[in-house]
Amino acid sequence: MKIVISGASGDLGRKITALLLQQVPASELILLTRHPAKLAAATALGAEVRKADFDDAPGLERALRGGDVMLLISTLSIGKRVQQHTTAIHAAKAAGIKHVVYTSSCGIQPQTPSISGKEHYATEHVLQKSGLHFTILRKSWYADVIPQLLMPAAIAMGTIGFSTGNGMVAPVAKADCARAAASVLANYRTHTNAIYEITGPQLFTLADMIAHCSTVSRKPIVYQNLSHADKQAIFDAMGISRDYQEGMMNDTTNAWASDEMITYEMAIKQGFFSICSRHIEMITGQPALSFAKVVQLHRASWDQQE
C-alpha cells in the first residue's frame, strides 16, 4: 500500500505524517510538497518525498504515480483552490490512485455564506462525481485558534470580539483532525464513500469560549458582540487584505483574507457550524479532546507573553 499526502510540509500534513509513521512503514508514504528540503527528516526515515505543485497538472500526475490512496489537504489559495483541487482529483485518477481522502469543512451547504465553505462544497461535488472512491473529513473550527493565536493579544488588551452572535460551534483540536485523517488513511478501505463531521465533543458560542479562557487566565477579558461591519472595520484598520494574498496564511498566524474570515463568522452566526458528532471517537477509538483540555495544553504560552 502506498499513501500519498499532499501539502505534507504544512503543519497538518506533518502531524498526519508523524502519526502514520507509527502505523505503517515509512516506505509506504509518498509525501508531496513544493519545498522538498523541508521534509529532509522524513526522507531520512525512508519516506519518499516528491516535489508537486497543484498549478502544474502534468507534474502533479507524475508525482502521484504509484499511489493507492491520496490525502488531499485543502490548499489556502482562496479563489484558486477549487481549480487546484479539481486538478489534483483529475491527476489522481489519471495516475491510477483509487481513493481520495479530502479535508473539507463543517457546514457544507450550498446556502452557506462562507467563501471557503462554497469552495469546499464545489470540491466535494467534483470528488463525488469523479468515479474515485472517497472519504470526506468535514473539519470544524480549530479549538487551538483562540488559546494559541488569539489569547495573548486578548489578555494584553482586555477585550476581544467576534461577529458570530449566538451561533455555536464544536471546536476541534488540530491534533484530533490529524488522528482521524491518519486512521482513515491507514484503513481507507473501511471508509469508502464516507463523509465524517470532525468536531469537538461540545457546542459553544464564541462568548462561551472566551469566558472560559478568561477564567483560566485569571484575567478579565471583555467579550464584544460585533456586527459584521464592525469586524470588517477592525480587519481593515489592522491592514489585513480583504482578498487572499499568496503566503499571508501560515502555521503561526491567523491573518487570512478578511472577506473569508467575515463570511466564516457569518456562517457560524447563521447556524451552519452547529454540528457536534462522535465521529472522531468512531474512527480512532478515542474521544475527541475537550475545549478545556486544548486550552490547558496552550495555557503555559500565555505566561510567556505576559
Indicate residue ranges for each PLM-predicted region.
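Oxidoreductase cofactor-interface core, primarily capturing Rossmann-like NAD(P)-dependent enzymes
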Residues: 1-28, 33-37, 55-58, 65, ...
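Residues lining the SAM
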Residues: 6, 73, 103, 285
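Short loop/helix-cap segments at secondary-structure boundaries that form the rim of catalytic
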Residues: 38-45, 62
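Rossmann-fold cofactor-recognition segment
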Residues: 43-56
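N-terminal Rossmann-like NAD(P) cofactor-binding module of classical short-chain dehydrogenase/reductase
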Residues: 64, 68-71, 101
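Conserved active-site and cofactor/substrate-binding residues in soluble primary-metabolism enzymes
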Residues: 83, 172, 204, 275, ...
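A hydrophobic C-terminal alpha-helical subdomain
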Residues: 232-306
